[in-house]
């Protein structure tokens, strides 16, 4: 295939570089061609963002006969170096709030569910520290991540205790007394300052790298190439930083997209310019080289599982012409919060049917009011969304979910669906002809409110 001038410049480059690649710009092709033009004796590491990308990359590098390229994820590298060496046992799904409370022997203080609120913050504190590049828990300011006023007041009051118990839980993992999390072994790997035996390291999807991942990458002596799209960061909720903006490497752009034509490219360019209203951003002009096709896939995309489910419920109950639908991933996962509570647990709490509640945290609550107070003190957005759905639809939820499952088609019949539902994380890299965004993304009002709160906090500090 004929390469663009931008691709040629990257392939012929020398030294550490960063590549800002727009959607559909032939990023993978460019990386493969870059690897092909390095010396055959060079040891090359390609760092994929997740396992599915890793498996796809292995196929592509193998097909090109590039036996000198090793494909890993940051976690698979850490797993081999930490888990095997220390014979740790890994907890696949992480710890739930009630499990942390039990492991640490947290006690109530008279306030409702005090120990669970504390445990919830410990869980998030650990995630923040493990994804950071900091050396000690004390170096991380967890309070900065809290925006809700009631949650912030709670954390301020109990900060020292939350921090101490965060350290205690990490120490239990370190000693092998309990199973370790994926975040933990990556953090331990970063703290050991590993030296990776490669001449070149190609770091893909760099815009979603955590500070811990970036720290490992930047400390290597190898020639470093970081690739990504500064406008496609979707893992900031996992404390990712836009690593392309954190590196001082020479910058190359891949601005020609083969995925869509000029109309979409021009619209995308205009939308990206809007970012200048909230942050400093380098303008980029996208050139659409793609051609239209006859596929007419319609998709609804949300930020959260439950926000998407709420929109799907609206479609099923209000739009009678929708006969077949498809959810990217397992549909059942859309009715659960990350920690395990299901929509039915919250519904059973509202109906005072505690004996039917499976999740330990929800089962510990007596009323919906208890759940509302817990949500206020923890900023648990997923439980808040569940509560909203239960209050809006009540016992109709049973028949609504049943109807959704009846309309849902299997993977091999996806193209027959009238509409596809997906979160932004599950549909990354996929293509749809028409997209409707659910209103669960951050709004201008919320951005302005957070800026106002930050300015007020800064004024208080300066006094």
Model regions and ranges:
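ATP-hydrolysis module of ASCE/P-loop NTPase motor domains
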Residues: 87-169, 352-377
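Conserved P-loop NTPase-based nucleic-acid remodeling module centered on helicase motor cores
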Residues: 51-126, 319-320, 325-333
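Conserved helicase C-terminal RecA-like lobe
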Residues: 344-463
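Short, well-ordered alpha-helices that flank and scaffold nucleotide-derived cofactor binding pockets
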Residues: 33-40, 59-63, 187-191, 215-222, ...
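P-loop NTPase Walker
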Residues: 1-87, 269
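Conserved helicase motor core of SF1/SF2 NTP-dependent helicases
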Residues: 19-29, 49-52, 77, 195-196, ...
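Short, surface-exposed amphipathic charged segments that create phosphate/polyanion-binding patches used
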Residues: 18, 82-92, 266-271, 338-348
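Conserved helicase/translocase P-loop NTPase motor core
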Residues: 2, 153-202, 208-219, 400-424
């Amino acid at each position: 295939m004929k390469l663009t001038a931008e691709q040629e410049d990257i392939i012929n480059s020398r030294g550490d570089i960063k590549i800002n690649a727009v959607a559909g710009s032939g990023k993978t092709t460019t990386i493969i061609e870059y690897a092909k033009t390095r010396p055959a004796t060079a040891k090359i590491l390609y760092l994929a963002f997740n396992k599915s990308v890793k498996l796809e990359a292995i196929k592509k590098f193998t097909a090109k006969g590039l036996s000198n390229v090793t494909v890993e994820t940051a976690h698979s590298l850490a797993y081999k170096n930490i888990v095997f060496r220390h014979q740790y046992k890994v907890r696949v799904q992480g710890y739930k709030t009630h499990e942390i409370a039990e492991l640490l022997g947290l006690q109530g203080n008279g306030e409702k569910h005090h120990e669970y609120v504390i445990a919830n913050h410990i869980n998030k504190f650990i995630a923040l520290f493990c994804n950071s590049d900091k050396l000690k828990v004390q170096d991380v300011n967890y309070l900065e991540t809290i925006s809700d006023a009631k949650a912030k007041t709670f954390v301020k009051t109990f900060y020292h205790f939350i921090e101490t118990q965060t350290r205690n839980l990490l120490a239990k993992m370190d000693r092998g007394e309990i199973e370790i999390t994926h975040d933990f072994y990556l953090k331990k790997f970063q703290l050991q300052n590993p030296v990776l035996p490669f001449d070149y390291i190609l770091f893909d999807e760099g815009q979603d790298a955590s500070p811990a991942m970036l720290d490992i990458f930047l400390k290597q002596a190898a020639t470093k190439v970081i690739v990504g799209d500064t406008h496609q960061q979707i893992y900031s909720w996992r404390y990712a930083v836009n690593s392309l903006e954190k590196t001082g490497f020479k910058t190359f752009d891949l601005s020609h997209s083969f995925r869509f034509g000029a109309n979409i490219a021009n619209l995308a360019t205009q939308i990206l310019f809007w970012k200048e209203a909230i942050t400093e951003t380098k303008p980029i002009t996208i050139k659409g080289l793609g051609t239209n096709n006859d596929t007419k896939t319609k998709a609804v995309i949300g930020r959260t599982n439950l926000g998407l489910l709420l929109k799907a419920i609206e479609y099923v109950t209000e739009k009678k012409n929708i006969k077949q639908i498809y959810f990217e991933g397992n549909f059942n996962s859309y009715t659960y919060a990350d920690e395990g509570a299901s929509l039915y647990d919250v519904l059973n709490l509202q109906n005072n049917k505690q004996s039917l509640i499976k999740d330990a945290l929800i089962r510990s609550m007596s009323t919906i009011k208890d759940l509302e107070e817990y949500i206020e003190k923890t900023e648990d957005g997923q439980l808040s969304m569940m509560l909203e759905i239960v209050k809006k639809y009540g016992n109709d939820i049973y028949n609504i979910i049943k109807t959704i499952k009846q309309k849902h088609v299997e993977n091999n019949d996806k193209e027959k669906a009238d509409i596809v539902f997906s979160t932004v994380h599950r549909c990354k890299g996929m293509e749809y002809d028409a997209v409707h965004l659910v209103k669960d993304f951050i709004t201008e009002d919320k951005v302005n409110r957070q800026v106002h709160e930050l300015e007020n906090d800064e004024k208080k500090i300066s006094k």
